[in-house]
Design a protein with these regions (language model features):
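Non-catalytic accessory regions flanking glycosidase/transglycosidase catalytic cores in CAZymes
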Residues: 1-135
Length: 135
């Protein structure tokens, strides 16, 4: 990496610095949000630190069971995702939703990252990924 040069005009009018980092907290992946200890800690963070949003990956992940194959049919269940969102709303917080990893039943491959094995391959059929049946 090369050098960087920063300049500051001290005679310029002061400009407020928005503290965007004070509103949102990151929390790894969504299945953790189903745990009581995680919920207690987040509730405390909200109450004591004022966080209003929480960001995590995997709200639609395999571990939450949002999409499974049953007898050659894709079956959606948002029960766990709903439980997470309902909890956040109940304590005055909101999810910062990240749509990231591919569900295994739609994936074109098996390449994954991180310890929870988020699938990083594109869908086999983009129409099915969007929830539309293929012809």
């Amino acid at each position: 990496m090369g050098d960087a040069l920063f300049r500051c005009r001290l005679s310029a009018p002061a400009v407020p610095l928005p503290h965007v980092w004070e509103h949102t907290v990151g929390s790894c992946h969504a299945p953790l949000a189903l745990r009581a200890d995680w919920q207690n800690q987040l509730r405390r963070c909200h109450n004591e630190l004022g966080f209003r949003y929480v960001r995590f990956h995997g709200l639609l992940s395999d571990r939450l069971g949002t999409l499974v194959r049953h007898r050659d049919r894709l079956v959606y269940s948002f029960f766990n995702a709903d439980c997470i969102v309902d909890f956040l709303l109940s304590i005055g917080m909101r999810p910062f939703v990240e749509l990231s990893f591919m569900q295994a039943v739609l994936a074109s491959g098996v390449a994954t990252i991180f310890s929870y094995r988020g699938n990083i391959t594109p869908p086999t059929d983009y129409r099915r990924r969007a929830g539309r049946p293929s012809s």
